A protein has these predicted regions:
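Active-site helical microenvironments for divalent-metal-assisted chemistry
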Residues: 1-177
């Protein structure tokens, strides 16, 4: 399950970059080279699976919001350095929505790895977020291309999301929605 979460988180990271109009100045291979570079950096930065998963999910958001001065105070230096290395990336369109930073950040840097796991699973268990990314036919084609290159498909991806949702429902206390 942990390997599936990491794989799903990394794939969502790549999809988030592509579907919100962030591109590299080079060709598609350059994009995947950069993605692999991000993966290797995160692996070297932290052996903690939960931190790596959460970092994947936040990279596109951090890159978008980094110009907000207060936001810099929420992230450790290694994440900010990694984002600075993504400087060649350019945003050509605005994202359709914003992640609720306070709640996400609290979970991401919680002292409890379980809290991070649960929050990550909650993030991954929102199929509507994933489906919104592929609503536009052009985006769907780009996403499918990315997933194909990473040897997975939409049905497999949604299956992982559903598994994460089931995991979260087992952890949640009765009465908490």
């Amino acid at each position: 399950m942990e390997n599936q979460l990491l794989h799903t988180a990394s794939t969502i990271c790549h999809i988030a970059f592509a579907s919100t109009g962030i591109t590299t100045p080079s060709d598609e291979q350059g994009f995947f080279d950069l993605s692999d570079s991000i993966h290797n950096r995160l692996r070297a930065i932290s052996p903690d699976l939960h931190v790596r998963c959460a970092s994947y999910l936040f990279l596109p958001v951090i890159h978008t919001e980094l110009k907000t001065g207060d936001l810099k105070n929420h992230f450790p230096a290694y994440i900010l350095q990694l984002v600075q290395e993504l400087a060649p990336l350019k945003r050509t369109t605005c994202p359709s929505g914003k992640i609720r930073f306070d709640k996400e950040l609290e979970a991401m840097f919680s002292a409890s790895p379980d809290a991070v796991s649960i929050r990550l699973a909650e993030y991954l268990s929102g199929p509507s977020r994933f489906l919104r990314m592929i609503k536009n036919p052009d985006r769907k084609a780009r996403v499918e291309k990315i997933l194909t290159a990473r040897k997975c498909n939409l049905s497999h991806q949604l299956s992982l999301l559903m598994q994460a949702e089931e995991t979260v429902s087992r952890f949640k206390s009765p009465g908490i929605t």
